[in-house]
Amino acid sequence: MLAAGVVTAWLSPLADADLPLHLRIGDLLRTSDGWPHLEPVSWTRAGAPWYAYSWLPEWLYAQAWALAGAAGLAGLHAVLTGASILAVWDVAHRDAWSVWGTRLFLGLHLVLWTIVQPATRPQLVLAIAVPMAWGAALRLRDGETLWGAGMALLAAMLAVNSHLLFPLGLAPGLLILAEAKRAPRGALVAFVAATLLGWCATPYLFELPAIFALNFATNALFGAGAAIQEHEPGFRWFTHAPLGMQALTFLMLVLPVLPSSFGQPAGRLRWLTVAWLAGLGLFVLAVRGLLLWWLLAMPLTAAALGSIPLPQRASTMRAVRAAWLFMLAALPLQAWQARMAMSTPGHPLPTPPLPHPEAAALEPVVAWLQCVTAGDVVATAAVGAHATTVFNYGSYLAWRVPSLSWSVDGRTIFPDSVSRAEAEQGRAGSRWHPPYGSAVAVVLPPWHVTGHLLDGDSAFVRVPLSRAGGTPERSTAHLWARRSWMEAVGPKSGRNACGNGA
């Protein structure tokens, strides 16, 4: 199981849409002398507060990339996935899950974290920290105070430096309340104290209230009309989710009323249901909460899966084992196929360094902008110059063309002047358009209605770009450059110098 998970993670395409932004922030952390407190990337938030609260995984991503490129990043992703599997297995061992329930839970855990959401993002560290917190609570319940408190401390330190929802690490403490008769006196106090102490190990300890206020503020990208798929409310997503995900979600919904749950002591069920409710609340707010719900409901889910009866006939049991082995072999194969599907066809431009979902559309733009902003004089003049794009493009462009300051990226903390334009997605009749009044370059999808405004604006010129042979223009991002900027960068913006015009 561990080998299948590690190999699957190693072969995953690293196609997470937010990964380039995490790499950009990691680069900033590697090259800066202190911890950022002001916006470092986007001109639309210039001077606004910002904190790199996920600094640990972002720094690791940037270090791995600097050392070995995509191979180093894949190796780090495999290590983190393996650590998550081991953390879950430890919980299964300490809580005496059945062999059958452990296998089913780990199998679904692998599918969720390597196929459904193969995230090379800080959330994966939370998939290590939360199971570690469960393991810590179980050790404290069993009287292993030193090991339990130390594990809770480490889990809290990992979580607070990796993810905004680090407070979820307190939920496993409910297990100590659930088995208060078995747990030694002071076990809960030790768990809470170790967790709170671990949370102090962040460079942003005194800024945590400001971090929560910034990231949980009302935003046009949230809610029922969310333009970002992972921010879609959970029950709305459920109505059109794939059948397998609907089945898993239904199982999660009915966990507290299953016979496997009623077979547990009343106190244990009551407190574990509180943790389940916390996860349900996250799922109701946004579908991305499903994975966190999975982590918070681990004991109840494992009990439900373990209650599924095993086949009695030897031939049927052999078939079940064969299907199990087939799934373990199919996971790496599916990851490899996903990597191949994300690869960009050969073209005269350099191969994208990451198989980002928008790489094929953006690499012609990237090649031209990198060429134009190359060189000491031009680069100095261009650093910090404003550029405008859309949410889906911003993460990749912020990483690939850091010499320009982009209007938006993969974060959800932008002002209404930016986020409302993203929420409406440039539809015809939109009252909101991406802010481009001070931009020297604008990069938009071919269908974006703002493109017609730019075509009619004499201050801008549309740049013809090289594309892969046979690649239709509608699949390549469009680029407009300010005429005065084109004149300032001089010959580099010409047809032959930067390869545009095919």
PLM feature segments, named:
Residues 131-149, 178-179, 255-265:
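Membrane-interface transmembrane helices that cradle and orient dolichyl/undecaprenyl
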Residues 18, 30, 71, 164-265, ...:
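Transmembrane catalytic cores of multi-pass membrane glycosyltransferases
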Residues 400, 418-472, 476-477:
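Periplasmic/luminal catalytic loop of GT-C fold multi-pass membrane glycosyltransferases
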Residues 44-71, 75:
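Short hydrophobic/aromatic helix or loop-helix immediately within or flanking a transmembrane segment
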Residues 6, 110-114, 135-136, 147-164, ...:
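Membrane-interface alpha helices of multi-pass inner-membrane proteins
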Residues 75-95:
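Transmembrane-helix motifs of polytopic, lipid-linked glycan transferases
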Residues 376-418, 438-446, 480:
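Short periplasmic/luminal acceptor-recognition loop of GT-C membrane glycosyltransferases, typified by
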Residues 316-378, 392-394, 401, 421, ...:
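Membrane-proximal, lumen/periplasm-facing interface regions of secretory-pathway glyco-
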